[in-house]
Curated annotation (Swiss-Prot):
Family (UniProt): Belongs to the RNA methyltransferase RlmH family.
Assembly: Homodimer.
Keyword Transport: no
Main location as per UniProt: cytoplasm
Molecular function in Gene Ontology: rRNA (pseudouridine-N3-)-methyltransferase activity
Function: Specifically methylates the pseudouridine at position 1915 (m3Psi1915) in 23S rRNA.
Keywords from the UniProt entry: Cytoplasm, Methyltransferase, rRNA processing, S-adenosyl-L-methionine, Transferase
Official protein name in the record: Ribosomal RNA large subunit methyltransferase H
Organism of this sequence: Stutzerimonas stutzeri (strain A1501)
InterPro entries per the UniProt record, alphabetical: Alpha/beta_knot_MTases, RlmH-like, tRNA_m1G_MTases_N
Coiled coil start-end: none
Protein's cellular compartments: Cytoplasm
Binding site for S-adenosyl-L-methionine: L73, G104, L123, S124, P125, L126, T127, L128
NCBIfam families assigned: PRK00103.1-4, tRNA_RlmH_YbeA
Length: 155
């Protein structure tokens, strides 16, 4: 099983890449965590935002292979504690399908992406900046793995 973070936006600051890589390298080889960036379409003053979101959604879904699980990150999704995320991670592992964690752009996810979602996860009721979301997801996946593995990181 692979976990793929499919996120709209690129050209993140160096500290974001460093933070992401810190957790990717800590995970074991049997739990690879990958980042797939979808370029953010330019939003001009007269942009057709609905069309741009739809295009981003198509690009996101293009990263998903048939049979893979889609989990959308949405403000109105279900909040998971670390223990609940660890339980989900174990279910995903037993299911043996790749997991795609989908993070939309500034206006959220395309309806087509949400319609394909098997699970909706909310990191927080707060609005979080996309750079922090990437690092937070990496850290929480690592923390969930340590909990399942009996590693002392999660106390």
């Amino acid at each position: 099983m692979r976990i793929k973070l499919v996120a709209v936006g690129s050209k993140m600051p160096r500290w974001v890449e460093d933070g992401w890589q810190e957790y990717v390298k800590r995970l074991p080889s049997e739990l690879p965590l990958e980042l797939h960036e979808i370029p953010l379409n330019t939003r001009g003053k007269n942009a057709d935002v609905a069309r741009l979101i739809r295009q981003e959604g198509e690009a996101m879904l293009g990263k998903v292979q048939p049979g893979e699980r889609i989990v959308t990150l949405e403000v109105h999704g279900k909040p998971w504690s670390t223990e609940q995320l660890a339980a989900e991670l174990e279910r995903w592992r037993l299911d043996a399908r790749n997991v795609n964690l989908m993070v939309g752009g500034p206006e959220g996810l395309a309806p087509e992406v949400c319609a394909r979602s098997e699970q909706r996860w909310s990191l927080s009721p707060l609005t979080l900046p996309h750079p922090l979301v990437r690092i937070l997801i990496g850290e929480q996946i690592y923390r969930a793995w340590t909990l399942l593995s009996g590693h002392p990181y999660h106390k």
